[in-house]
Amino acid sequence: MCGIAGELAFGAAADVGAVQRMAETLGSRGPDGAGSWSHDAVALAHRRLKIIDLSCAGDQPMTDPELGLTIVFNGCIYNHRELRAELERAGARFFSTSDTEVILRAYDRWGRDCVTHFKGMFAFAVYEHESRRLLLARDRLGVKPLYLADVDGALRFASTLPALLAGGGVDTELDPGALHHYLSWHAVVPAPHTILRGVRKLAPATTLLITEHGERDERCYWEPDFGRQERYAGYTKQDWDDAVLEATRAAVKRRMVADVPVGVLLSGGLDSSLIVALLADSGQQRLATFSIGFDDVGELEGNEFRYSDVIAAEFDTDHHRIHIDTDRMLPALDGAIRAMSEPMVSHDVVAFYLLSQEVSKSLKVVQSGQGADEVFAGYSWYPPLRDAPGSGADAYRMEFFDRVGDEMAQTVADAHLARNDPSREFLERHFAKPGADGPVDRALRLDTEVMLVDDPVKRVDNMTMAWGLEARTPFLDHELVELAGACPPELKLASGGKGVLKDAARGVLPAAVIDRPKGYFPVPALEELEGATLDLIAATMSSDAARTRGLFRPQYVDMLMRAPNDHMTTLGSSKLYQLALLELWLQAHGI
């Protein structure tokens, strides 16, 4: 895992200084090394976190003069050894044992289609010296981020949005359509948009080829099928259980590929516990596991250690309980906001930030259970869609959207209000696409391709990489996602959600863990807006910067402030916190 940045200028020399400033902001993503390369119209920079091939042979930017290619890469190609062997049989010669060089050689052999050969998480840029073209690519599920900005006569890219801001020249006006998404989708802004008009993000499963003249060719190379498929027509329930278990086992095993130790973030829930169980079953001994807990606040419990302790004891892990005192929360909130590439409102952002800080003191790589709820239908909004009329888009909107009807106009000031309903339009377009059989399938596809990418996946990447920690997410293995997409929705909805995953796990996990009530990352100090947290919000919303910006109608903000814990979204999040978080993020990043 690393940080990348670069610029391709059109008809001029690249701004090397801007790229260097961008790279400097990526230091936490790559504390083990820094490198840069430039030639005429192109400049590339890299910050390295050493995970595979710890020698200087794996340093980046990596250039092969014989091939005429230079690459910067963030991520991990889990099948790099298999691909290396295949490429060697075809005559390729390697000077390192890095997965970076495998991408370079694969690109030489297969061109932009090389991405279809990769099993992993990645965002990379390859520059062709002779043609002066630049290829940008992002993995199938968008685990690794890649942000883009058009500046005067050039295209810039970076692993984070703040890195692009550091380069200068970026249009930082807010995008009204993106603001509408932010206030509808729990802060998610679907690709290619971001909250800022001048910054875009490359969509998952996408390659973008840019010529020296600025011409662009963008292609999507993968899209999972959420319909029933002929090859699974004869599957029994037991067949599905077995297939899901084996696909999960393969995904977990793949993510142990590293030249450094790999641990697990263990909440004690089904998903992270299954990762631990499968690793123990494969022979991993004294696996390092980590759980986090906070002070209780009133009746709100601050930890789930009793569940993680069961798994740690069952599989004899080297377990670490990490307790965070309440007085660390507010300073950590500031740090977490500064680490966000885009504003994110989930309270567990702070939990991941603090957990990553502690884990990074002893490890560079962990596996984490994000994604299983979206892939295997673990959330509360899926069951009501079973009998939804039509495409199911209206039912999904009523179950999921933070604001419906006239409330958006009551929230946002006229100058920043979208003149249509872009969030509803996006939802209806997505639900109308072929490749999903019913409303539940359509919702799972949307959540897998959009919500998952720009909420939990982005959250984990941003918070772990703030401390130079690489997080790997086996439930986002594309082969596992393809299998889950084909699985009948009734099997996923069973047993209160994730039914097929629960039944698949019964042979390897204690029933007490599988059948426990669904939990969430508990962060009690932020659940109730009071004390120092409420004071911070009040000061932020009444600040000169907020008043000058004028995003929200004052009477709406005043209403929320009078009863800060009474106004909640459909899924139970604070509407006031959502507004304040955006303003805090904008101020933290100098916007």
Tell me what each language-model feature is.
Residues 1-340, 352, 503-507, 512, ...:
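Cysteine-centered catalytic environments shared across enzyme families
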Residues 334-338, 382-384, 528-530:
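Short low-complexity, flexible loop/linker segments enriched in glycine and/or proline
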Residues 344-346:
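Acceptor-substrate binding/catalytic loop of class I
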Residues 376-401:
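A mobile, often basic/glycine-rich helix-loop segment
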Residues 1-4, 21, 113, 166, ...:
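Adenosyl-5′-phosphate
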Residues 363-373, 377-379:
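Short acidic/histidine-rich active-site segments
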Residues 266, 369, 452:
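Conserved S/T- and glycine-rich ATP-binding loop of Class I adenylate-forming
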